[in-house]
Amino acid sequence: MIQVLLVTICLVVFPYQGSSIILESGKVNDYEVVYPQKIPVLPKSKIQRREQKMYEDTMKYEFKVNGEPVVLHLERNKELFSKDYTETHYSPDGREITTSPPVEDHCYYHGYIQSDIDSTAILNACNGLKGYFRHHGEAYHIEPLKFSDSEAHAVYKYENIEKEDETPKICGVKHSTWESDEPIEKISQKKDFLEEKKYLELYIVADYVMFRKYGRNVTTIRMRVFDMVNYITVVYKALNIHVALIGFEIWSLKDKFVINASTKNNLLHFSIWRSTVLRKRNDNAQLLTGVDLNGYTLGSAYLKAMCDVLQSVGIVQDYSKSPYLVGAAMAHEIGHNLGMEHDTKTCSCMRGNCIMSPEEEGSDFPMEFSSCSLYDFQNYMLTDTPQCLINKPSNTSIIKNAVCGNYVEEEGEECDCGSPEQCENNCCEAATCKLKPGAKCAKGACCKKCQFKKAGAECRAARNECDLPEFCIGQSAECPMDRFHKNGHSCQNDQGYCFRGYCPTLAKQCITLWGSDAKVAPDECFQNNTNGNEYDYCKKTNNVIIPCKPTDVKCGRLYCTGGTENPSEGEKISSDPCKASYSEIEDIGMVDHRTKCGEKMVCSDGKCIPL
């Protein structure tokens, strides 16, 4: 009996290669036990003199995979957080509690495998090594074996994780036919903008379901979010975009609005919350939800909306145990904000899956953007030039020591155009990162030939009749913050009212859904919305259908006439002159928020209310 017991204990403590095991990522059907050995990076004398930190800036580990030695080089991601990073949660009595925790000495790393030029590593060293690395074209996970007192780790291929759900997850963003109508000569003047280093200050919110899902443990959720952002920073480096987490918020008491299965409604309400309630300045905000979204949808975002006061947002479902898969979904939605459409069959990536694939593909983590995505991104940058991306964060809030010559304008620098051999900026002294004598600026929408443009020079044209142009002030290289007409300003020949820089109208929505020849249907068609059936209603809450009141009928299902035979989204459910669209997966075909529904009246949450 004693002999049997000893054998059992040995099997538990020292798992063998090829067995199944339950790990944090799920059930793994084939894995290998490794014992990472730390290799000193600096000579002992330097290690002793070095400032004492809990986590080192650079580390090196060696272990074997399939009998082959692997040397893992790691460097701490010093650009993960902004200097003014904050965290917010809520007390039981409803008080908002915001702190500025120390995050400089964190445990999140990027790296590579020695002698493997195409390798990548994204992991944390908070308690052992945990994360993802790519070696010889294969995707691997590594994580500590919790039930072992030794340094044992499990290494396994991503493909060997037993899938939680075999059904492919899809993105809720629909294809658009947007094309630039700017003249080539005007676009060519914006090439400098495309080449500039860009900063994306990201704010992430975890909803109340997330809080409950992870046992109300704030530390567990924040570590998961940090893993996601660590992944996102890697993939966006390829676009010369530095992503820094500027704030993280947990709705630990209750959600700030009703979050349900409809990504369209959630996205709208989150965008309104961000623009009217959230006080922390940010370039983009993402809502991480534990709610199961409609159908197989894993997220959604507004297309070409980066820096927009209202629409620079996305929503992502926490659909997988792997933080990197959820991080990939968030990187995908941010890509939509940056103008990228879904990849088609003609798009491809050199290393496996592409980030902008319309559905999650289970064979590997996406690590790069396709040529199609790069084309979309470049077009969007050249036509829309989202200014928040080149606004240097306050105090260059990236946590790292300034390095002259890295193209990043950091604290203490007036400019940074690369090394003296690489610099092509006539206003910047490359060796010192200072402006040349007589120069007042080196770049910016209000900088020309090293001088500030005169006050009154237009630096950002109005996008539409609800937007306002911006003009240089004569004392700065930066274009002033984007402004627009006040809400309620009449637009589109009195067909609508401006709302945060946009003019939502029934006519425009019909054209989007049914093509350029479509028009708004006769008023009697909208009376169907009083029926309160599967298709005709004003609001659906938790699958409960609420019919429209007679005064609210133009705030329910959208009815159009003419145009194409089938809609661009959803399925046709009725014919001319009362054409409508419907989809079970998404709440498609409903009248948009703030659309005009009467004189001085607009739609809001399925009701026609006064401005």
From Swiss-Prot:
Gene3D superfamilies: Collagenase (Catalytic Domain), Disintegrin domain. GO terms for biological process: proteolysis; venom-mediated fibrinogenolysis in another organism; venom-mediated hemorrhage in another organism; venom-mediated suppression of platelet aggregation. Residues 1-20 form the signal peptide. Inhibited by EDTA, but not by PMSF. Binds 1 zinc ion per subunit. GO terms for cellular component: extracellular region; host extracellular space; plasma membrane. PANTHER family: ADAM A DISINTEGRIN AND METALLOPROTEASE DOMAIN, DISINTEGRIN AND METALLOPROTEINASE DOMAIN-CONTAINING PROTEIN 28. This is Zinc metalloproteinase-disintegrin-like ohanin.
